[in-house]
Amino acid sequence: MELADRAVGLLLSSISLSIFTYYTFWVIILPFVDSDHFIHKYFLPQDYAILVPVFAGIALLSLISVFIGMVMLKSKKKKA
């Protein structure tokens, strides 16, 4: 089981690092590259650089709120 945990941890770390690298390059470096350069076809338009994290944050906060609400409802049922 320890080997599987390490593999999952390595996979999650690799995914996180690749997303961070992609987003950093997209937001910080790409605006300084000419718009007709071939590298632009690998990235979404700059508008999405703000929209994607905002919607991801809203979705995360919504899921956390639903989870907390369900836990609170279950704890009320146990007390009653």
From Swiss-Prot:
Pfam families, per database record: DPM2
Assembly: Component of the dolichol-phosphate mannose (DPM) synthase complex composed of DPMS1, DPMS2 and DPMS3; in the complex interacts directly with DPMS3. Associates with the GPI-GlcNAc transferase (GPI-GnT) complex.
Organism whose genome encodes this protein: Arabidopsis thaliana
Family, as annotated: Belongs to the DPM2 family.
Membrane topology: Multi-pass membrane protein
Pathway the protein takes part in: Protein modification; protein glycosylation
Domain of life: Eukaryota
The organism's taxonomic lineage, starting at the top: Eukaryota, Viridiplantae, Streptophyta, Embryophyta, Tracheophyta
Protein name: Dolichol-phosphate mannose synthase subunit 2
